[in-house]
From Swiss-Prot:
This is RNA chaperone ProQ. It holds the Pfam family ProQ_C. HAMAP family: ProQ (MF_00749). RNA chaperone with significant RNA binding, RNA strand exchange and RNA duplexing activities. It comes from Pasteurella multocida (strain Pm70). GO terms for cellular component: cytosol. The gene is proQ. Belongs to the ProQ family. Residues 123-132 have a biased composition (Basic residues). GO terms for biological process: post-transcriptional regulation of gene expression. It comes from the Bacteria. GO terms for molecular function: RNA strand annealing activity; RNA strand-exchange activity.
Length: 210
């Protein structure tokens, strides 16, 4: 025996009702006003249907008749229909006004919720930006301090190129730092030196220090 797959939510139940009673219920377009007391007819028609319970039918019917599409179609003089789509009454002015009031209240509620959400979003973002900026500033300050701390204070004394000999230890200024080197050869206004890393370069007198 095949197990019956029960419906689990209003959306599924309403879709099932549209399938069973297409002349009464609909998912698109303007919905038709329903017969007064339709729930009883619905409960009797589906009393042996294991897929849906009376409680589910009541909840789904309430959701269907509270939908904006249904309320929009509830105008004075509109024809009410039964499960088979037969006309069984006219929507009275009182009921039409009640439907219009429900529709207006529902729209106002949604508009208020959207406005509240829109107003709340900037409030959440601003502190985050301020914290991020503060954190970034602190990070930059720490980094700058670290850089300043790491820079060694190098004392450089000018040296006469003519006094240099092969094998002398000197300092070569490279950018903002000074690197130790050994003199390999002195030629006119420059000298060939070997840095600690083994690199051999030729530098002019203004870059050589004791």
């Amino acid at each position: 025996m095949t197990e019956v797959q029960k419906l689990t939510n209003n959306k599924e139940v309403i879709a099932y009702l549209v399938e069973k009673f297409p002349l009464c219920f609909s998912l698109e377009g303007e919905a038709k006003p329903l017969k007064i007391g339709l729930f009883q007819d619905l409960a009797e028609a589906l009393q042996d249907d294991e897929r849906v319970s009376k409680t589910q039918l009541r909840q789904a019917l309430r959701a269907y008749t509270s939908n904006w599409r249904y309320l929009h179609g509830c105008k004075a003089g509109a024809e009410r229909v039964d499960l088979q789509g037969n006309v069984c009454g006219i929507l009275e002015q009182e009921h039409a006004e009640h439907a219009a009031q429900q529709l207006a209240e529902a729209k106002a509620k949604v508009a208020a919720m959207r406005a509240a959400e829109k107003a709340a979003k900037p409030e959440k973002k601003r502190p985050a930006r301020r914290v991020a900026a503060k954190g970034q500033h602190a990070k930059e300050t720490t980094t700058n301090k670290a850089k300043v701390t790491r820079k060694p204070k190098v004392i450089l004394n000018a040296i006469e190129l003519a006094s240099l000999q092969k094998g002398d230890s000197v300092k070569v200024k490279v950018g903002e730092s000074a690197k130790k080197a050994i003199v390999l050869e002195v030629v006119k206004d420059s000298a060939r030196v070997q840095l600690e890393n083994g690199l051999v370069i030729t530098v002019t007198a203004e870059h050589l220090f004791a």
